[in-house]
Amino acid sequence: KCCMRPICTCPCCIGP
């Protein structure tokens, strides 16, 4: 999953 990567730009990672 994108959120599990060292560099994440997904909404779930950069969200509140």
Curated annotation (Swiss-Prot):
Keyword presence, Nucleus: no
Domain notes: The cysteine framework is III (CC-C-C-CC).
Keyword Disulfide bond among UniProt keywords: yes
Native species: Conus regius
Primary site of residence: secreted
The protein's name in its UniProt record: Conotoxin Reg12e
Intracellular or extracellular location(s): Secreted
Molecular functions per Gene Ontology: toxin activity
Disulfide-bond pairs as recorded: C2-C13, C3-C10, C8-C12
UniProt tissue specificity: Expressed by the venom duct.
One GO cellular component, as annotated: extracellular region
